[in-house]
Amino acid sequence: MAVNLTEKTAEQLPDIDGIALYTAQAGVKKPGHTDLTLIAVAAGSTVGAVFTTNRFCAAPVHIAKSHLFDEDGVRALVINTGNANAGTGAQGRIDALAVCAAAARQIGCKPNQVMPFSTGVILEPLPADKIIAALPKMQPAFWNEAARAIMTTDTVPKAASREGKVGDQHTVRATGIAKGSGMIHPNMATMLGFIATDAKVSQPVLQLMTQEIADETFNTITVDGDTSTNDSFVIIATGKNSQSEIDNIADPRYAQLKELLCSLALELAQAIVRDGEGATKFITVRVENAKTCDEARQAAYAAARSPLVKTAFFASDPNLGKRLAAIGYADVADLDTDLVEMYLDDILVAEHGGRAASYTEAQGQAVMSKDEITVRIKLHRGQAAATVYTCDLSHGYVSINADYRS
């Protein structure tokens, strides 16, 4: 059950000049499910991408990394769901390359101009023959249809759009889709994210922007603490809005475009948490007054990924000990626990090393019963802060994963 998340309509997701979308039923996932997506990219576009840090990364990740920086430029992204093509050895790479070659024939480019992406069951051979056979049968699609086609255990398609001024004269459009529900943890989580914009950005600058946006959005979420083998986040800049190229991070338009795309990416990232497997609550954990951003992030993740804390949220249990314990084992050097303050929404619940004198169990229960909760922790040792987004851990998470292959 997704937390305050609804499906976007095609009208809410405008087309991006220079991008064409296609989908098909390849039979990789389950019969009757659309499970294949192709994003065709206009010549002259630039692409930035970041990938999972899991050392067991999937075959398509290896291929996508090598094709990203090819001098010929990226002309297509092909995405299948139902099979991750991970843990498949050399044959997995052969299959991913075969899919690239077939997609290249379909749109009229070179195989090295196609980036492959897969998501689904690990340790199963990719049925490349099904994907190759389905490519000629693909039909034009809208963004909301593409968002549905890349889903695995997701319950709601995830898509968003933004429009805004970049520079004095040009309006920039951006639309993106993402998938993810379980195996969600930073660097990156089991998620795929694709954003297209009509802005014009040089490839090196777009690559840097993509990494920065990932760090500020998709790398601030956690559902279950597992880092997947297939995670990928891609930004495509088609350059079709007639503006001059952004080729330097000192260009004021860099910050303007990054802010616009960051807003879009954060909505997609939060949508993944809202649709976390079995989630019934959306939780924001913010740590303030840390010495460094890394320290703040470390403390926030300790609270956000703790199974004890997450199950307490599911149970609407205002027991504070689990939250304080999580901060205590976050390995923040020389932490003075007497200075730490913790809030549930705006209610002070802990200070001076223990329970706040003003706090009552009834206050905590009222907050914990909500479906959206903010936990704010003040360390009182500096000016740095970090925010992490998570969800509760319910019986539904166990059921979904127990039944995933059945």
From Swiss-Prot:
Under catalytic activity, the entry for this protein gives: N(2)-acetyl-L-ornithine + L-glutamate = N-acetyl-L-glutamate + L-ornithine; L-glutamate + acetyl-CoA = N-acetyl-L-glutamate + CoA + H(+)
Localization terms from the record? Cytoplasm
Q: What SUPFAM superfamilies does UniProt report for this protein, alphabetically? A: DmpA/ArgJ-like
An annotated GO cellular component: cytoplasm
Pathway as given in its UniProt record: Amino-acid biosynthesis; L-arginine biosynthesis; L-ornithine and N-acetyl-L-glutamate from L-glutamate and N(2)-acetyl-L-ornithine (cyclic): step 1/1; Amino-acid biosynthesis; L-arginine biosynthesis; N(2)-acetyl-L-ornithine from L-glutamate: step 1/4
- Top-rank EC class of the record's enzyme: transferase
- Active site (UniProt): 190
Site feature location: Involved in the stabilization of negative charge on the oxyanion by the formation of the oxyanion hole: 119-120
Predominant place of localization:
cytoplasm
Q: Where is this site: Cleavage?
A: 189-190
Q: Name one GO biological process term.
A: L-arginine biosynthetic process
Q: Where is the signal peptide?
A: none
Keywords carried by this UniProt record: Acyltransferase, Amino-acid biosynthesis, Arginine biosynthesis, Autocatalytic cleavage, Cytoplasm, Multifunctional enzyme, Transferase
In its UniProt record, a GO molecular function of this protein is:
L-glutamate N-acetyltransferase activity
Its EC number(s): 2.3.1.35, 2.3.1.1
Q: Name one Pfam family in it.
A: ArgJ
- Quote the subunit structure annotation: Heterotetramer of two alpha and two beta chains.
Which purpose does this protein serve, as stated in its record?
Catalyzes two activities which are involved in the cyclic version of arginine biosynthesis: the synthesis of N-acetylglutamate from glutamate and acetyl-CoA as the acetyl donor, and of ornithine by transacetylation between N(2)-acetylornithine and glutamate.
Q: Which family does it belong to?
A: Belongs to the ArgJ family.
Protein name stated in the entry: Arginine biosynthesis bifunctional protein ArgJ
Q: Which organism is it from?
A: Neisseria gonorrhoeae
Instruction: Identify the coding gene.
Output: argJ
